[in-house]
Each structure stands twice: as C-alpha cells, then as structure tokens.
C-alpha cells in the first residue's frame, strides 16, 4: 500500500478542497478513506484493502474494550503482536499474548479488550464478501454507539 501526502505552500490551503474534489471525481479512495481512525477504545490503521481481504492494525488502550459484536458478511483472524488481549468468543473468554491468534467465524459474537496497563496491538485480517464498518452489529457497547 502506498502512503500519499498532500503538501501545499503556506497560504495556499484554499486549493486543498479543489484537489480533494478532483480525486473524488476520479474515484480515488484516498479522497474519502483515512489510514488512521480513532475510536473511544483506541485506534486502527488500514494496512490493506482489497477485494479478497482487509487488514487492520488495532491498538486498544489500557483498560478499554471494543463492543461485543458480530458480522453478517465477514470472518476475522486476530494476531496479537504486542501486549495481552482479552477475547470473548461466544460464551468463552481467552487471554492471548503476543504471537498468539484466534479465528472469529462469520456470525460469531466476539469482543476484544485490554485489561492491562499497556497497549494491546492486534493485526486483524478480515475475509468475506464485504468489509464496510456498517457490517458491525453491536450486541453491547461500553461507549453506547
């Protein structure tokens, strides 16, 4: 994945809107999608977005949890790369350290959490027919979204 930056001279930022509109007219996803997105629980970075899969790096802040959720159109595979994650999968709870992974089947209720004092970093690989954020069905959410 290529990273792109838009650099403009000081005092010429009024041209940014025109550049964005031109990118949108050419259907460039860089105009509408952001690599980093911040959430109440931490943040994620989109590493790869293809027709076959989507890959994200999730960083869960200490003491925070993602919503209990499921998906209609995708399964996920989580690999913990830093810290110790708490994972709820159905009625089971798992504690996963760096180097460990877990499969989240399509339709399975799941949640990711961090009950430690250090950030947890997880690589999430999504596989299925659709990867939009609107395929998240929240069962319960500590942030009431």
Predicted regions and their residues:
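Active-site loops and adjacent core secondary-structure elements that bind or stabilize anionic groups
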Residues: 1
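Left-handed beta-helix
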Residues: 4-79, 84-102, 110, 131, ...
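Double-stranded beta-helix
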Residues: 32, 111-145
């Amino acid at each position: 994945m290529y990273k792109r930056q838009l650099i403009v001279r000081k005092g010429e930022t009024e041209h940014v809107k025109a550049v964005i509109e031109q990118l949108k007219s050419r259907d460039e996803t860089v105009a509408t999608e952001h690599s980093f997105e911040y959430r109440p629980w931490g943040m994620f970075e989109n590493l790869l977005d293809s027709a076959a899969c989507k890959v994200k790096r999730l960083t869960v802040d200490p003491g925070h949890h993602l919503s209990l959720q499921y998906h209609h159109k995708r399964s996920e595979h989580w690999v913990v790369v830093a810290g110790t994650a708490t994972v709820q999968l159905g009625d089971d709870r798992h504690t996963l350290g760096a180097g460990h992974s877990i499969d989240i089947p399509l339709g399975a209720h799941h949640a990711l959490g961090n009950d430690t004092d250090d950030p947890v970093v997880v690589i999430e690989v999504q596989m299925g027919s659709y990867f939009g954020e609107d395929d998240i069905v929240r069962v319960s959410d500590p942030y009431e979204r």
